[in-house]
Amino acid sequence: EIWEYAKADTLKGEYMLRRGKDALKLKLKEGSMRIGQKNYTVSKLTERTLPDYPTKDESDFLDNGNVGGKVTLRGRIVNVPKGHEDRVSISIPDPLQTIFDNELPIECDSLGRFELDIELANTGVVRMLWAKLILTPGETYFISMDGQTGQTFVMGRDSRLSNELLTHDTPYYKVKSSDFDKKSDAELMEAVEKDYERVKEIWMTTEQASPMLSKRYRLLSRWQWKMGAAYSLVQRRYDSPDVRKSDDGQLWQWLRDSVFSDIARPYTLVQDDLAYTFDNYTSELLKPRNSGGYSFEFIEEAINIAEERNQADKDSLAILSQSMNDYRSKVNGGTPDSLLSDHPFHALIRQMFANGTPLMQIIKSTEPNERILLKNIPRVRDLDLSEELKQLSQAVAIYSQLEQMHGPLSDALRKVLDETVMPPYYRDRILMRSKYFADLAAKMKRGNGCLMPNEPLADLKDGKEIMDWILEPYRGRIVYLDIWGTWCVPCKANLKQFTKPLHQKLRDLPVTYLYLCNNSSDKAWASAIAEYEL
């Protein structure tokens, strides 16, 4: 609890504290403290974090089954670090988000004190300035932070693990998948095993030096390394065609045996990277990589939609489909990429999916993605995963589609959601996000942006010519140019995280902000600029 000083005699070490109508006497002297009528032996904290706890703790993590619950945070932050003066916040990973964390502002009074309630699905990790905290629904925590000294303490019944993490940082996965862009999966997995041997040494050294570290610390340290490795490894889905052909299943088998068959309990402990990692892992199981680099399933759905709606010449669509099937059979048959570089399928893709074509308009609508999703969600039931992870996979897939569409649930997705078994917390998160986009659409104002007409640019092919035409009205001004798309997840992450701080930092300069969005539907574009306040 936070108490106010009513009286203070620092020379005698005597204090009177008040909280509402309650009063408390406090007397301090070297090595002892008297609170009310009770005496305590104390020692002054001079280090940045607490020393190791003197007793063993073999308790397990509390798992509430992802029903959600409130966590109360109280505390004081002094000497706020540079760059955070205008906004101190707490970052809460969302178990269904593949990229964004939820950030909540912390309102401090003139003395740096704060009180905040947050909702968590389950026991999990949050970040507050430089501190990584483990919080459990139903608990109250008091946090003391000093941005100048870095001194950080957490108090409360469930504070031990947070203090241990502040004192003993956990080792992270250090293999860069990008260093293996032209190497086989087997070579990458050899590097993973070497990194595992490295962290085993760190764990052994740390636990020998600090034998009282809790069981929960030991478990979390291992789970976090494995999830860091998994997050990096699943990105092999996007590597070069040559790498894709080297896939012997070893990488995906390791993920199954070492990560998803022995995942953290509760898995919200590793939710920082879990949604993205798991989404890619299940996508690989449902739609394995191919060495051709194309999403044939996606192209097929776009062709099907165009045929159903008579939005493109049927003969042209038939030629594209026939060429794709020929190309796909050669890819699956192991034909070297060098012999496929002149295949007519490449030219057909460039021609029929160019800007302004019917197929490109269909892609912008995100409808092909939704059709694939509707087919794949039932297929998740057949995957070799625990029931808990199957439900997570389905929830992440639906939530990710909302983010991709930047709009509310379609009728088809809502029907699938109603028919899919998942924890109520997941369902509520999806429905809340859908309502958010629906409300955003209802109050959207188009005054912040305008559609660029295609006609003046139709005959321009050179990139410099196109950019000169776009920038001509702003010549002589300072222009900040950002090119993005509603389909581009990193673009949207940067817009969400950096737009407001950038505008604030440059507020005294005569800057014109120009955000160019391409290959995106009008609806998704309008929704995104409203959300990010562009």
Predicted region positions:
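Acidic, polar-rich low-complexity tracts and alpha-helical solenoid repeat scaffolds
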Residues: 53-60, 68, 442-455, 508
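Short, internal strand/loop/helix patches
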Residues: 362-363, 526-534
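Conserved helix-turn-beta segment immediately C-terminal to the redox Cys motif
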Residues: 477-478, 495-517, 530
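Conserved redox-active cysteine motifs that mediate thiol-disulfide chemistry
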Residues: 475, 483-501, 520
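Oxidative protein folding and maturation machinery
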Residues: 149, 156-472
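C-terminal substrate/ligand-recognition segments
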Residues: 457-460, 474-479, 487-491, 505-506
